[in-house]
Amino acid sequence: MYSIKMRSSNQDIHISGAETICEFDKIEQTVQRFYNKGFFHENGQPDFLNIKIQKIMEPIKQIKALQIIEDDKANLQHLTQKCGVTEQALNQGMTYIKNETVYTGAIILSAISGKRLDSFGHRGIRATHFSFEDINNKGDLNERVTDALAIASCINAHPYVKGELCVSDDLTYTTGYFASAKIGYHRLFDIKPVNTRYGGRIIFVDDRIDLNHYILFLESTPKQVVYETV
C-alpha cells in the first residue's frame, strides 16, 4: 500500500489538497486525478504543486466512519452544545475561521475556554495518511463528502475529542459540517457567503487530552476509514 498526497498553492496561499492510500496498481490513475484537481481548481491557478508518494511500512488502523445524519435544519449552536462545547469556545472557533489568516491545518481549541492548545501557528495540525473504503460499493457519496467524512472520522476517533467544525475555503462551496463521535456527521448548509475564501478546521477537545499522542496519531498513523450503511 502507498500513501499519495497532493498540495497546491499560489504565493503560499492554499489552493487545493488531496490524499489517499492505495495499492500499487492504482498509483498512476490517482496521481492523474490529484494533478487535475490541483491545477484546475476554482480557487485559482497554482504556482506550486507537490505530489508525494510513500510506501506504507506499518499496519493500517481501521476506523469506522461516522454516521451521516441528514438534517437540512441542523443548527450549529445546538450541535456543539450537545457535545459539551461551550458558546465561548464556539465563538472563538468561528473567529479563527473568519479571520484573514490562512491556516493549512486544523486548530485545536479547549472545548470549555476556547483557548488554543496546539502551538503550530499557521501550519496547524494535519490529518494525513488515511484512505476511505465504502464496503457497500454503492457509490452514493461524492468525492467531496468522502474526503470530509474520512477526515472527520479520523479526527473524532479519540475519547477526549468533543467535536470538529469545518468550513471549506473553496470560493463557491458554502456547506460546512460539524462532526463528533457522539452525534455523527452533520452538514451545515449556507454556513458562509458565496465567493469568499475564508474557512478552516477547528477541533474542540477536553483539556485532559494528551496532545502529543493525539497529533502523532493524526499525522503519522496510517488509517483506513470504513464506511458501511445498514
Curated annotation (Swiss-Prot):
The keyword Magnesium applies. It holds the Pfam family BioW. GO terms for molecular function: 6-carboxyhexanoate-CoA ligase activity; ATP binding; magnesium ion binding. The keyword Cytoplasm does not apply. Its cofactor is Mg(2+). Keywords: ATP-binding, Biotin biosynthesis, Ligase, Magnesium, Nucleotide-binding. InterPro entries: BioW (IPR005499). Its EC number is 6.2.1.14. Pathway: Metabolic intermediate metabolism; pimeloyl-CoA biosynthesis; pimeloyl-CoA from pimelate: step 1/1. It is an enzyme of class 6 (ligase). Belongs to the BioW family. Homodimer. This is 6-carboxyhexanoate--CoA ligase. It comes from Staphylococcus aureus (strain MRSA252). The gene is bioW.
